[in-house]
């Protein structure tokens, strides 16, 4: 969800005029947030393209800016189902990893943009039942 967020961009409207890095963003302006970019930004992530689940250990999360990772948006317009989604993902992944070994068959993934991020090339995986 960090490297491949379902929503690679989301729109918001600025509530008040702001200056960001010398640019004036007027009140009411449409602003596009890009988790795809933020989640890979080296200011927030050391070796951003490397998969490292330890980044999300509680002691390391404290070091990170609150909005360096926002796959469900943030603030009052954050996805209402984010906690359910995280719980369901962990349970499903845990059950699959308990019962199967995974091996990638296809290398490299072609992605496309729609309302959500989409896989445009095969992403086959070989599953072998565990013991």
Predicted regions span which residues?
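Cytochrome P450 heme-binding "Cys pocket" and the immediately downstream C-terminal segment
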Residues: 83-118
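Conserved cytochrome P450 K-helix/beta-meander segment immediately N-terminal to the heme-binding cysteine loop
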Residues: 9, 17, 33-61, 105
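Active-site-adjacent bridging/hinge elements
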Residues: 60-69
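Conserved cytochrome P450 K-helix E-x-x-R motif and the immediately C-terminal K′/meander segment
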Residues: 1-21
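C-terminal domain-closing interface element
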Residues: 121-131
């Amino acid at each position: 969800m960090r490297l491949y967020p379902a929503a690679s961009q989301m729109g918001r409207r600025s509530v008040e005029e702001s200056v960001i890095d010398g640019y004036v963003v007027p009140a009411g302006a449409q602003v596009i947030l890009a988790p795809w970019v933020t989640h890979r930004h080296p200011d927030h992530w050391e070796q951003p393209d490397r998969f490292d689940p330890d980044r999300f250990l509680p002691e390391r999360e404290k070091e990170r800016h609150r909005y360096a990772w926002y796959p469900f948006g943030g603030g009052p317009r954050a996805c209402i189902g984010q906690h359910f989604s995280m719980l369901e993902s962990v349970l499903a992944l845990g059950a699959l990893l308990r019962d199967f070994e995974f091996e990638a068959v296809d290398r490299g993934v072609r992605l496309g943009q729609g309302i959500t991020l989409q896989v445009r090339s095969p992403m086959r995986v070989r599953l072998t039942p565990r013991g």
